[in-house]
């Protein structure tokens, strides 16, 4: 049972480290805990964002690094974090906030992270956001570009 408890603690630490990396708001930091074969899926699928490889996600994420400042992401309640040792998955609910030239941006996310066997790296990411907030930001960006 000690191995089970240790792996659970490692999975939880990797998940919280992932959020810490998001708060550094650099491409290198956001990619640092991903395996080379890590896939990143955005949901809902109605957003039309494809599943990205690690390299593709770095390019996608890099588009937003200069757009936002004072970014912060936080786990809403660590007690509500779901850690499944057998499947090496962690599910967590987060809230994010950032400043943009178009005003403040806030959103909510559910993350499903699948880790490596030792729990120290991320093999797969499913990110589910409040799509209305994401679409609102994109519409503001497009309006500014067309103005």
Regions found by a protein language model. Give the residues of each.
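A beta-strand edge to alpha-helix "cap/lid" segment located at domain peripheries
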Residues: 3-5, 65-147
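Short, well-ordered alpha-helical segments
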Residues: 12, 55-58, 107
